[in-house]
Amino acid sequence: MGRRPARCYRYCKNKPYPKSRFCRGVPDAKIRIFDLGRKKAKVDEFPLCGHMVSDEYEQLSSEALEAARICANKYMVKSCGRDGFHMRVRLHPFHVIRINKMLSCAGADRLQTGMRGAFGKPQGTVARVHIGQVIMSIRTKLQNKEHVIEALRRAKFKFPGRQKIHISKKWGFTKFNADEFEDMVAKKRLIPDGCGVKYVPSHGPLDKWRVLHS
């Protein structure tokens, strides 16, 4: 018996059911890589960030996440180059879905119990997504804006329901607005740290502040 179609598991009907010592024998998720492209690019190299945002409360299968990841990555590599972007899948498939297998061969009614003891066996994993939750993000250079929108548009076709494409006002994957970011770095309120930044608050020991601004 093959894999049941993902439309059967589209809606969030049950409570979250993660893999645990009570829920064993769960098959591995299809998606294993969540960060692609130039992951080690410094925070100031990729100021533009585009998000794919869910417009429905639903479940997305790990197979769909993997298909969308491959689709967006292929387009971005072709249009911006292998080192011209950093893509991150923001959902992780932790919710386990079950299947109550039914036999359809001759004499099956003698072998199976129907809906008696119908709690199924683990079949796969899905990610539960809320309205307004980010599914995928891509950071890149400002001139690649149209390519980001097109890559996310193509990836949208791999998912059920509605999604929106949103170009963020923030700088890259940080939580700081792009128009304030460079001023804050110049004033040493932000210290670049990999693909993120460290925020330096205006309170604390004076000695630390003096060392930073010396």
From Swiss-Prot:
One of its GO terms (biological process) is spermatogenesis. It comes from the Eukaryota. Its main location: cytoplasm. Keywords: Cytoplasm, Differentiation, Meiosis, Ribonucleoprotein, Ribosomal protein, Spermatogenesis. It is found in: Cytoplasm. One of its GO terms (cellular component) is ribosome. The keyword Cytoplasm applies. Component of the 60S large ribosomal subunit (LSU). Belongs to the universal ribosomal protein uL16 family. This is Large ribosomal subunit protein uL16-like. It comes from Macaca fascicularis. The lineage of its organism: Eukaryota, Metazoa, Chordata, Craniata, Vertebrata.
